[in-house]
């Protein structure tokens, strides 16, 4: 119930951070059956409920009401998904989104969830591109296809749908790019150098080059 009166923007950014913390352990190199179950269930709950809780926050702000019982169920979905993401990352790892977001947190006054939201679509696209070029037999390619199916509800969805779906979600929730927080092209070289050695980067499903990392940040501005 403490989440009912959160501003919609805060609900959106923290919800997208929770989603990131479910996606990254699912596709990372240390994914395992325990974390897979947590991630699949958590992602399903986010897909079902994130838009609803953001919309309900706007209703609360306007009318001062927590809304119908289904809103309580959606809030519970997001709380459970957040818990599952924490358990998953602790038992598998993260990836390039947090590998970049961690150092960026010390360079700019930007909300962590908003940073993750801005980076998430670009990282998904870059990982898929790199996997297909440099690791075409990687299990992670199948995981991205499964992720696409979880996000879209389409059993035939391919991995390319992940970044498209995420871009639409971030745009629909009104999350701005990193430029809104003062991050510009001049920050990219330093950020990339810090990201390369970030602990979260170690479990990314494929090693990304400095050029690829720079392109991700540029696309998130």
Question: What is the predicted function of each stretch?
Answer:
Residues 39, 75-78, 159, 188, ...:
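Hydrophobic packing residues in well-ordered alpha-helices of helical domains and bundles
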Residues 185-221:
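Short, amphipathic C-terminal "tail helix"
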Residues 19-23, 78-86, 120-123, 166, ...:
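Short alpha-helical scaffolding segments that buttress acidic/His motifs in well-ordered protein cores
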Residues 107-110, 114-187:
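Gly/Pro-rich interdomain helix-loop hinge
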Residues 1-92:
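Carboxylate- and glycine-rich phosphate/diphosphate-binding segment that chelates Mg2+/Mn2+
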Residues 83-116, 198-203:
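Glycine-rich phosphate/pyrophosphate-binding beta-alpha loops
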Residues 16, 43-46, 97, 116-117, ...:
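A general structural signal for well-ordered alpha-helical segments in protein cores
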């Amino acid at each position: 119930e403490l989440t009912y009166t959160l501003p919609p923007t805060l609900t959106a950014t923290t919800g997208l951070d929770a989603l990131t913390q479910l996606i990254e352990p699912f596709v990372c190199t240390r994914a395992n059956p325990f974390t897979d179950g947590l991630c699949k269930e958590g992602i399903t709950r986010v897909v079902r409920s994130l838009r609803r809780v953001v919309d309900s926050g706007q209703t609360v702000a306007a009318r001062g009401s927590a809304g119908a019982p289904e809103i309580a169920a959606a809030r519970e979905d997001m709380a459970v998904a957040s818990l599952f993401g924490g358990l998953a990352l602790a038992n598998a790892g993260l990836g390039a989104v947090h590998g970049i977001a961690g150092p960026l947190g010390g360079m700019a006054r930007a909300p962590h969830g908003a940073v993750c939201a801005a980076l998430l679509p670009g990282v998904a696209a870059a990982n898929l591109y790199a996997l297909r070029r440099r690791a075409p037999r990687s299990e992670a390619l199948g995981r991205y296809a499964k992720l696409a199916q979880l996000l879209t509800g389409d059993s035939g969805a391919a991995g390319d749908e992940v970044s498209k779906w995420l871009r639409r979600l971030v745009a629909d929730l009104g999350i701005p790019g990193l430029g809104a927080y003062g991050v510009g092209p001049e920050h990219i070289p330093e950020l990339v150098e810090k990201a390369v050695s970030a602990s979260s980067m170690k479990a990314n499903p494929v090693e990304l080059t400095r050029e690829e990392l720079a392109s991700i940040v540029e696309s998130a501005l």
